[in-house]
A protein has these predicted regions:
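Non-heme di-metal
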Residues: 1-146
């Protein structure tokens, strides 16, 4: 593994930039596992800059809550809408956790900072995958709702 590949910051950057929701979640879990095994350094030899925004799938289009269509909360469609919203929240939580791992490159942080945020990111990834699995069992996925 090269110095860049085994850099926690670089791996966090790659999670953040990933545009495919399921791959992002799996990659977050893989980075957590690699860190647990001691395979990642918490410093970076090369600064590629930090993304302003996380990678996102082309769909669904991100809208302000005020621009979202009103959905009924009851019935199967309402439950699917709720699961979909929760999956989207978990995807954003993955990005928030992994953004924190690299954004403060010039501020020395204790190892526990990285360990804790990696754990948070991995937990959010697990939550996303559980919700995604449930949505798939209902014939849907995290993405645009009809």
């Amino acid at each position: 593994m090269s110095d860049i590949q085994n850099s926690l910051r670089e791996q966090a950057r790659e999670v953040l930039l990933c545009c495919h929701a399921e791959k992002k979640a799996q990659y977050a879990l893989d980075v957590f596992t690699a860190h647990q095994k001691g395979e990642l350094r918490t410093s970076l030899l090369e600064n590629k800059g930090w993304p302003e925004r996380p990678g996102r799938p082309e769909t669904p289009e991100l809208l302000s809550p005020k621009d979202m269509p009103k959905r009924r909360s009851g019935g199967p469609a309402g439950r699917i809408g709720l699961l979909h919203a929760l999956a989207h929240i978990e995807l954003n939580a993955i990005d928030l956790a992994f953004d924190l791992l690299g954004r403060f490159e010039n501020t020395p942080m204790p190892e526990e900072f990285y360990t804790d945020w990696l754990r948070v990111g991995a937990e959010e990834a697990k939550h996303f995958m559980l919700l995604q699995g449930r949505l798939k069992s209902l014939g849907r996925h995290e993405g645009p709702l009809p």
